């Protein structure tokens, strides 16, 4: 079975720690985005097989399985499942890949996927950063950041910085859309 993305939504971007969303709980704005998405689709919420949400720092207000919480806060039936996955900066893309794999395997037909992160409400590296001492000394690359990851991928696949920037510009022009208006 083929997988297709039928719709998408996003929140406005705002400045971390000082922007319009800095005082809004991430579960609140995530559920508002899901409500708008569901209002624009002609599907029965009971048909949703799972809500799969990526989150790099699933703790604090975006912990406790925020994928499930945003499903409940959005008015989905209490039987609706939800899961939160973590692949750091690639978490939301991983959510999409998991849904696609589930569809291909015949384990469902309708999934809501996304990503949620509040850099204002949960600080970078989380609340209690405590790397394993062995990795700190023997393999610090275990905690590589997104910038280094991008450089590694670019080198591995032969993608220049200019090509990356051009691709980013094209995507931003294609995907310009009105963000979901949030109650703050």
Question: Which residues make up each language-model segment?
Answer:
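Conserved active-site "lid/cap" helical segment
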Residues: 1-56, 60-62, 66-70, 74, ...
């Amino acid at each position: 079975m083929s997988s297709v993305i039928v719709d998408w939504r996003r929140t406005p971007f705002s400045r971390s720690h000082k922007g319009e969303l800095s005082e809004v709980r991430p579960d609140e704005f995530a559920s508002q985005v899901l409500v708008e998405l569901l209002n624009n689709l002609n599907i029965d919420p009971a048909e949703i097989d799972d809500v799969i949400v990526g989150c790099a720092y699933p703790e604090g207000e975006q912990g406790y399985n925020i994928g499930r919480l945003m499903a409940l806060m959005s008015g989905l039936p209490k039987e609706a499942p939800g899961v939160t996955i973590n692949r750091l900066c690639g978490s939301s893309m991983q959510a999409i890949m998991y849904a696609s794999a589930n569809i291909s395997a015949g384990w469902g037909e309708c999934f809501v996927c996304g990503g949620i992160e509040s850099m204002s409400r949960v600080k970078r590296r989380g609340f209690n950063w405590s790397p394993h001492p062995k990795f700190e000394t023997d393999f610090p690359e275990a905690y590589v950041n997104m910038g280094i990851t991008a450089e590694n991928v670019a080198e591995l696949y032969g993608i220049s910085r200019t090509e990356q920037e051009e691709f980013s510009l094209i995507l931003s022009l294609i995907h310009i859309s009105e963000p979901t208006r949030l109650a703050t």
